[in-house]
Structures are given as structure tokens and as C-alpha cells.
UniProtKB/Swiss-Prot annotation:
Keyword Membrane in record: yes
Organism: Homo sapiens (Human)
Family statement: Belongs to the major facilitator superfamily. Vesicular transporter family.
Membrane topology per record: Multi-pass membrane protein
Mechanisms controlling activity: Potently inhibited by L-vesamicol, reserpine and tetrabenazine.
CDD domains named in the record: MFS_SLC18A3_VAChT
Protein name: Vesicular acetylcholine transporter
Activity-pH behavior: Optimum pH is 7.
């Protein structure tokens, strides 16, 4: 009996704790914050999986070559070709073919990728670009799917696909499997990234809170791109290739379970919430001139990042005789100005929300100036300053224009955000699909200086285009046709007849029949019209 009492008390305590947690999960403000945490973790995972292979894949492909049909070299000496990631948006990496092997790597060098042969260089470039390419192809389909299914189910699908991709990475034994895993990640990102950002825009409809929430999401993207390569390199060195991917797979599974607990995407209430208004088709959104201007700015601002990353390490070695440590550390300090840019834009947007276009234009100008300054740097410190300016400008553009897309949908279309953020994801994917494949060829044919100056000039020329958005803040929120019709008084031969409210089971004790297929639609209307 004495032993039964503590067991009963433990069960009672567990029941009370479960009820308290359940009540907390259903409280609207806490639920909204938990949704933000879930989305931020999903974005963090996507970027960590994107970057964690940077120190692993070149060495892994070289290991495959050593045991396969490819040529072998003795001693095993390579140069680093994939720089450490930038703290801005998820980026693509590729090796550069112009360097030659020099000194042997010291022990414990898994944090720095080995230099592959020329044929492997092409393989790595295609491998890194495959994610963005598939994401680019899937987004025109995932956007309308998200509009139709609401946001939680596509986010759950994206997390599930990312989990499968991560596990496939862990057990990949050949290039074809690596390519399949990388492409599968692009499929998951097309659902998880787009639905996650759209969910934030939907949960935070008011502008100051929306900008702040999207800024937090961008900070998680930045942190994920920064921490993933050292995370992957350390675990790869001391625990093996599979461990970093299995850790990320476990976090992805936990995030999916948390989403199931918080959003309950398959419950009856979730199905009722999913009965959203019909969203504007994605092709019509693409033809909206304001949305087209924003999408062009997002692509333009990310081109310098996507094109400099695969090429700047070799340029540093040839221009300033940079050491391996300097090449690896070049992007690391840029994390601070990127987060600072996000914070500054959020604060300014809260105080002057009608000047979002100006913050984006200033960001493009900073990116253009920084990109033009890069070729003039002849030492490590000025180069770091210019790269910090580049990431600061990208933070200004992203933080200012992502909320602007949601606002444009609110005031000019239907407030359903899947398709518009699919357009934003397409804008990013264009830059990162081209960067790993064509950046090296441009450098070899035209030169690094011409590449940097061209990208800087493109950003400087695009900055005045954002003047077209200067009147966006003066627009008023539109109302859907359904809302207008419901608010109009009956006219002519029609009288308004109020529907009898039906009792709900559990509220008055009376049973009710099972809901029919059209009950959710009927509940949306308070009145119907009938001929008098």
C-alpha cells in the first residue's frame, strides 16, 4: 500500500503536468510563439544540412576515388576550395579548378575540405547546385499546394522529406546516392521553407510583429549557415561521417513531432482552419509589378554572395597569399553585421513602416559598393570589412522586403501567403543554382575583378528601381469579395434570414449528428438569402 501511494501521486502529477502543458499549447499567444520556434528550427535544420556537407563531401569523394576507379595521388595533398559559409541565406559551394596541390594537410584537418581533381570539381559543383535547382523547379507547384492545404501540413511534409534526406546522406556510399540525397533536400526545402515563412506571415498579421518574427527567422538562417561546417567537421573527424547527419535527423524528427503536438494538422479544428480563401494563382502574383520588383531585388542581392563564395578562396591565395586559416575565417566575422542589419531593420520598420523600400534600396547600395571594393582589397582586414558590408546589406534587403511581400498580398490580393513566398524562394534559388556552376567559368574567362564589379554595378543600378515601391505603404488592406457581400444589406426581392445556431456536443449535453461535408462551409456564413 505504501508503495502504491507514491505511484498514484506520480501518476496524478504527470496527469496535471500533461493538462498544464496541453492548456499552454492551446493558449493563442504561446501557441504562436511555439509555431515561430518550430519554423525557426526547421529553417536552421535546412541551412545546417545545406552547409554541413562542406567539410565532408570533398574528402568523402576523394576517399571514394581512392578506393574506386579514379586516379590516386601520393602523398594525399590538397588545397581548400570550399570557403566557410557566409552568415546570410543558405548558399551554395563549389570547388575551384585553378589551384594546384601544394602542402600536405596536418592531422585533424577535417574542418578544411581537401582539393579534388578537375572531374571531381565538376561533380561537387553539380552536387551543391542540385538542391537549389530542384527547389527552383518545385516551388511553382509547392506554392499553390500550400495555399490549398494551409501551412502546417506542407511544413510537416517538408520536415519529413528533410529527415529522409538526412538519413540518406548518413548512409550514402556513392556519388549517385549523395546526389539523390541533396536533390531530395531541395524538395523538402521547397515545402518547409516556403510554408514556414508563410506561416509566420499568417500568424503575425500586424506589421511590427511580422517584421520582428521574420527577422528572428532570418537570424536562425544565418546561425545555421555559420555553425554547420564546424559542427560537421568536428563530428566527422572524431565520430565518423554518419554522426552529424544522424544528429540533424533526430532534431528534424523532434521538430516534426513538436509540430504535430502544437498545430495538430490532422485534427478537425485544423481541417476547419485549412478552409482558407482561394489564393491568387502564382502566375498572377508573378505578373504583379510590385511583387516582380521585390523578387528581382531578392535575386540581385543574393547573386554576389552566391558567386563570390566558390571563387574568393582561390583569389585570396593568388592575390594576398592568404593562409588556409585566413581563407576559412574570411566569412566568419560577417555573422555579426548580418544580425545587426536584421535588428536595425526591424527597429526602423517598427517606427517607420512606410519606408521599407528605402531600407531595401540602401541595402542594395551597400551590397553594390562592397562588391566593387572586394577586388581592390590586398590584405585580409579590408577584405573582411567588405564582406561584412556585403552581409549587412543582404540583411537590410531581406528583412525589409520579405514582410513587404506579405503586405502586398494583403492589400492587392487574397491574404494567403504560400505562392508569394514560393516566388521569394524561387528568387533565392536562381542565384544559388547558378553560383556553383557558372561562377568559376566566369572568373576563368573574364576575371575575378570583372565578376565582382559586374555584380556590384547590377546592385547599384537596381537600387533606384525600388522607388517604384515608395507608395506601397500608403495602400490600404483590401477586403475579399466574400466579406463585401456578407456585409452588404439585402436588397430587392431578398430578405436576410438568420440561421438557427445548432448546439455543439458537450456544451449543452444534447447530442448532435456527425458533421457533414459542407458543415465547415456553412459555419463560415451567418446569413443566407432566400426569395421572399
Amino acid at each position: 500500500m505504501e508503495s502504491a501511494e507514491p505511484a498514484g501521486q506520480a501518476r496524478a502529477a504527470a496527469t496535471k503536468l500533461s493538462e498544464a502543458v496541453g492548456a499552454a499549447l492551446q493558449e493563442p499567444r504561446r501557441q504562436r510563439r511555439l509555431v515561430l520556434v518550430i519554423v525557426c528550427v526547421a529553417l536552421l535544420l535546412d541551412n545546417m544540412l545545406y552547409m554541413v556537407i562542406v567539410p565532408i563531401v570533398p574528402d568523402y569523394i576523394a576517399h571514394m576515388r581512392g578506393g574506386g576507379e579514379g586516379p590516386t595521388r601520393t602523398p594525399e595533398v590538397w588545397e581548400p576550395t570550399l570557403p566557410l559559409p557566409t552568415p546570410a541565406n543558405a548558399s551554395a559551394y563549389t570547388a575551384n579548378t585553378s589551384a594546384s596541390p601544394t602542402a600536405a594537410w596536418p592531422a585533424g584537418s577535417a574542418l578544411r575540405p581537401r582539393y579534388p581533381t578537375e572531374s571531381e570539381d565538376v561533380k561537387i559543383g553539380v552536387l551543391f547546385a542540385s538542391k537549389a535547382i530542384l527547389q527552383l523547379l518545385v516551388n511553382p507547384l509547392s506554392g499553390p499546394f500550400i495555399d490549398r492545404m494551409s501551412y502546417d501540413v506542407p511544413l510537416l511534409i517538408g520536415l519529413g522529406v528533410m529527415f529522409a534526406s538526412t538519413v540518406l546522406f548518413a548512409f550514402a556510399e556513392d556519388y549517385a546516392t549523395l546526389f539523390a540525397a541533396r536533390s531530395l533536400q531541395g524538395l523538402g526545402s521547397a515545402f518547409a521553407d516556403t510554408s514556414g515563412i508563410a506561416m509566420i506571415a499568417d500568424k503575425y498579421p500586424e506589421e511590427p510583429e511580422r517584421s520582428r518574427a521574420l527577422g528572428v527567422a532570418l537570424a536562425f538562417i544565418s546561425f545555421g549557415s555559420l555553425v554547420a561546417p564546424p559542427f560537421g567537421g568536428i563530428l566527422y573527424e572524431f565520430a565518423g561521417k554518419r554522426v552529424p547527419f544522424l544528429v540533424l535527423a533526430a532534431v528534424s524528427l523532434f521538430d516534426a513531432l513538436l509540430l504535430l503536438a502544437v498545430a495538430k494538422p490532422f485534427s478537425a479544428a485544423a481541417r476547419a482552419r485549412a478552409n482558407l480563401p482561394v489564393g491568387t494563382p502564382i502566375h498572377r502574383l508573378m505578373l504583379d509589378p510590385y511583387i516582380a520588383v521585390v523578387a528581382g531585388a531578392l535575386t540581385t542581392c543574393n547573386i554576389p554572395l552566391a558567386f563570390l563564395e566558390p571563387t574568393i578562396a582561390t583569389w585570396m591565395k593568388h592575390t594576398m597569399a592568404a593562409s588556409e586559416w585566413e581563407m576559412g575565417m574570411a566569412w566568419l566575422p560577417a555573422f555579426v553585421p548580418h544580425v545587426l542589419g536584421v535588428y536595425l531593420t526591424v527597429r526602423l520598420a517598427a517606427r517607420y513602416p512606410h519606408l521599407q523600400w528605402l531600407y531595401g534600396a540602401l541595402g542594395l547600395a551597400v551590397i553594390g559598393a562592397s562588391s566593387c571594393i572586394v577586388p581592390a582589397c590586398r590584405s585580409f582586414a579590408p577584405l573582411v570589412v567588405s564582406l561584412c558590408g556585403l552581409c549587412f546589406g543582404i540583411a537590410l534587403v531581406d528583412t525589409a522586403l520579405l514582410p513587404t511581400l506579405a503586405f502586398l498580398v494583403d492589400v492587392r490580393h487574397v491574404s494567403v501567403y504560400g505562392s508569394v513566398y514560393a516566388i521569394a524562394d524561387i528568387s533565392y534559388s536562381v542565384a544559388y543554382a547558378l553560383g556553383p556552376i557558372v561562377a568559376g567559368h566566369i572568373v576563368h574567362s573574364l576575371g575575378f575583378e570583372q565578376l565582382s564589379l559586374g555584380m556590384g554595378l547590377a546592385n547599384l543600378l537596381y537600387a533606384p528601381v525600388l522607388l517604384l515601391l515608395r507608395n506601397v505603404g500608403l495602400l490600404t488592406r483590401s477586403r475579399s469579395e466574400r466579406d463585401v457581400l456578407l456585409d452588404e444589406p439585402p436588397q430587392g426581392l431578398y430578405d436576410a434570414v438568420r440561421l438557427r445556431e445548432r448546439p455543439v456536443s458537450g456544451q449543452d449535453g444534447e447530442p448532435r449528428s456527425p458533421p457533414g461535408p459542407f458543415d465547415a462551409c456553412e459555419d463560415d456564413y451567418n446569413y443566407y438569402y432566400t426569395r421572399s
